[in-house]
């Protein structure tokens, strides 16, 4: 087992794009940890609409007010990334009961791959509980207003890329 630091958390995701729900979760988790690493996954199997570098830049801009948060893109197995940064906690968000089955399965798999790391689930603030990146992308793709769901820079990037 690797040496891990339970004061360091990794919040992984595709963040395609980062939303106000993601930002809320990081903002509420930031005081709980010495450091949070937002790991932006390449995720080619998901066919992201925004390139990795742009997703990283948008997340950095959205989270820049938190001194203990860093944003790093990665294209490896999550378990390898977590070990690389020395984190002892995987941070995940649960919006609804429908998220639980998938997240439970992922947490169980990660427990086998990185048993020294704990998974911690946080729920979003109620006003963000329905927001998902895929819904934000779809609304933007169809010409809808997503300014209430994502930062202005994300809204502009979606308009340019979709």
Curated annotation (Swiss-Prot):
Annotated substrate binding sites: 14, 46, 78, 92
Residues where ATP binds: 14-15, 22, 93-95, 103, 128-134
Keyword Magnesium: yes
GO terms of molecular function: ATP binding; pantetheine-phosphate adenylyltransferase activity
Record site feature (Transition state stabilizer), residues: 22
UniProt KW Nucleotidyltransferase keyword: yes
Protein location: Cytoplasm
Enzyme Commission number(s): 2.7.7.3
Pathway stated in the Swiss-Prot or TrEMBL entry: Cofactor biosynthesis; coenzyme A biosynthesis; CoA from (R)-pantothenate: step 4/5
Family per record: Belongs to the bacterial CoaD family.
Name this polypeptide is given: Phosphopantetheine adenylyltransferase
Species of provenance: Xylella fastidiosa (strain 9a5c)
């Amino acid at each position: 087992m690797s040496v891990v630091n339970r004061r360091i958390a990794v919040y992984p995701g595709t963040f395609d794009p980062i939303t106000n729900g993601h930002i809320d979760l990081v903002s509420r988790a930031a005081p709980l940890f010495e450091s949070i690493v937002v790991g932006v996954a390449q995720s080619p199997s998901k066919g992201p609409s925004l390139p990795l570098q742009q997703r990283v830049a948008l997340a950095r801009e959205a989270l820049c007010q938190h001194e203990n948060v860093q944003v790093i893109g990665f294209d490896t197995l999550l378990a390898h990334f977590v070990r690389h940064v020395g984190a002892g906690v995987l941070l995940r968000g649960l919006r609804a009961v429908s998220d639980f089955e998938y997240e439970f399965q992922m947490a169980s798999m990660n427990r086998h791959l990185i048993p020294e790391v704990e998974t911690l689930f946080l729920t979003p603030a109620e006003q963000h509980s329905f927001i998902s990146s895929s819904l934000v992308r779809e609304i933007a793709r169809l010409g809808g207003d997503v300014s209430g769901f994502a930062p202005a820079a994300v809204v502009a990037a979606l308009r340019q890329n979709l």
